[in-house]
């Protein structure tokens, strides 16, 4: 289970299932 404020973007969690978090993750990095 994942929430917007929980997004970790790990290659193992694939950014919280189907949520579009890749873009957000890239920004964070």
From Swiss-Prot:
Expressed by the venom gland. GO terms for cellular component: extracellular region. Signal peptide: none annotated. Keywords: Disulfide bond, Ion channel impairing toxin, Knottin, Neurotoxin, Potassium channel impairing toxin, Secreted, Toxin, Voltage-gated potassium channel impairing toxin, Voltage-gated sodium channel impairing toxin. Its main location: secreted. Changing residue 22 to E: 9-fold decrease in inhibitory potency on human Nav1.7/SCN9A. It comes from the Eukaryota. Disulfide bonds join 2-16, 9-21, 15-25. It is found in: Secreted. GO terms for molecular function: potassium channel regulator activity; sodium channel regulator activity; toxin activity. Inhibits voltage-gated sodium channels Nav1.1/SCN1A (IC(50)=630 nM), Nav1.2/SCN2A (IC(50)=230 nM), Nav1.3/SCN3A (IC(50)=770 nM), Nav1.4/SCN4A (IC(50)=1290 nM), Nav1.6/SCN8A (IC(50)=630 nM), Nav1.7/SCN9A (IC(50)=15.3-1000 nM) and potassium channels Kv11.1/KCNH2 (IC(50)=4.2 uM). The presence of a 'disulfide through disulfide knot' structurally defines this protein as a knottin. Belongs to the neurotoxin 30 (phrixotoxin) family. Negative results: does not inhibit sodium channels Nav1.5/SCN5A (IC(50)=22 uM) and potassium channels Kv11.2/KCNH6, Kv11.3/KCNH7, Kv1.1/KCNA1 and Kv1.4/KCNA4 (IC(50)>200 uM). This is Beta-theraphotoxin-Gr1a. It comes from Grammostola rosea (Chilean rose tarantula).
